[in-house]
């Protein structure tokens, strides 16, 4: 199939994760949504072994991005880019659920931006 369309609620899940990459059958980059209830977090980690850059986009809620041990409150609409070596976690200390879109790709993927971008 040359394209695939899926609503977030129809994506395959694993715990708090919406597995967008798997649902859309992507091979060039990773893209998933983590939905964190109040008081939850994702495990602290880095992406050094896979040499992956990550972009976080806060879709809803007000989680805290903890980057190298430093707290960065992030309201809905916030973007963050992380080099592979940075330790990271997402903590939802607020009263409302938080949803964060995470996009990742190896730095060696060969991506070349268009001139206008």
Language model features with spans:
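A short, N-terminal "cap"/entry segment at the start of jelly-roll beta-barrel domains
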Residues: 1-30, 37-38, 111-117
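Short histidine-centered beta-strand/loop micro-motifs
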Residues: 21-23, 43-49, 91-93
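Short, conserved beta-strand element in jelly-roll/cupin
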Residues: 33-37, 48-66, 103
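Histidine-centered metal-chelating micro-motifs
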Residues: 41-43, 80, 85-90
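Structural motif
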Residues: 55, 62-64, 71, 87, ...
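Short acidic-glycine-tyrosine-enriched beta hairpin
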Residues: 69-85
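Double-stranded beta-helix
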Residues: 89-117
């Amino acid at each position: 199939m040359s394209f695939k369309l899926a609503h977030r609620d129809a994506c395959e899940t694993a715990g708090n994760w919406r597995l967008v990459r798997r649902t859309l059958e992507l091979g060039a980059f990773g893209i998933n949504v983590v939905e964190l209830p109040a008081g939850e977090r994702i495990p602290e980690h880095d992406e050094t072994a896979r040499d992956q850059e990550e972009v976080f986009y806060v879709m809803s809620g007000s989680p805290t991005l903890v980057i190298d041990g430093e707290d960065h409150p992030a309201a809905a609409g916030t973007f963050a880019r992380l080099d592979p070596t940075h330790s990271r976690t997402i903590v939802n200390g607020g009263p409302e659920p938080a949803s964060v879109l995470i996009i990742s790709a190896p730095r060696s993927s060969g991506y070349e931006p268009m001139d206008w971008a």
